[in-house]
Amino acid sequence: MKNKGLLSASLALMMALPMQAQKFEDNFENKTLRLDYIVAGDSVNQAIYFEQAYSNPTWAGRKTRLDEKFLNGNGQVTVYEHGTNKVLYVNTFSTLFQEWQLTQEAKHLQKSFESSFLVPFPKKPVDVSITLSDTHQKVTAELRHTINPQDIL
C-alpha cells in the first residue's frame, strides 16, 4: 500500500514538471539577437564593453531547456526577464581573449578582442549578463545591461 502511494506521488510530480517548463514562444521570437562586445585587458585584468546588437531572421538554437547550462566554459551569457532574476536563456562559452591571457605577451601588453554571442530574440526588454571566469570558475569580469528589442533594427 505504501508503494502505491509513493508511485502515485512520483507520477503526479513527473506530470507536473513539463507544465512548469518555459515555452520558447512565451518570451522569444523565431529570430536571433546577435550581441557584440569588446573584451579587453591583460594577463591580470579584464573588462567587458557592449558594442552593438543586431537582429537576424531566424533562430537556429535550442528551443527547449533554455534556462539550463549544459557545459562549463570560461564565460556565460545569461538573459533575464527585465527587472527580475528569472533566467530565460543561458549559454556558456570560452573566448580567444581568455586564451591570449595565458600567453607571455599578455604579461606586458593590453589588448582588446571582439566577441559575439547569439541569443534568442526577446519579445520584451531583457537584462543580459556577460560573465568571464578564471580556470577555477571565479568570476573575473561581468557586465549586465538592458536590451530593448524595439531599439534593434
Which ranges hold each PLM region?
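Extended acidic/polar, glycine-enriched regions
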Residues: 109-153
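Bacterial Sec-dependent N-terminal signal peptides
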Residues: 1-25
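Residue-level signal for secondary-structure boundary sites
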Residues: 17, 85, 136-138
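Serine/threonine-rich low-complexity intrinsically disordered regions
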Residues: 3-5, 103, 148
